Amino acid sequence: MNWKVLEHFPLLLYILAAKTLILCLAFAGVKVYQRKRLEAKQQKVEAEKRKQAEKKES
């Protein structure tokens, strides 16, 4: 077995942990972006419904 590889094992674990953290934050950011975009779309639809309801009342 190559013992030199085991000397770098803690560094490899830190790199793996950092990569995992970066990916997790990236996915969380995408989810937040998608939710904001969806909320904006829903608000637009609700505003259009209100306008149509006001036109029917007039």
Swiss-Prot record:
Pfam families: FAM165. Keywords: Coiled coil, Membrane, Transmembrane, Transmembrane helix. This is Small integral membrane protein 11. It is a single-pass membrane protein. InterPro entries: SMIM11 (IPR042125). One of its GO terms (cellular component) is membrane. Disulfide bonds: none annotated. It is found in: Membrane. The keyword Transmembrane helix applies. Residues 29-58 form a coiled coil. The chain crosses the membrane at residues 9-29. The keyword Electron transport does not apply.
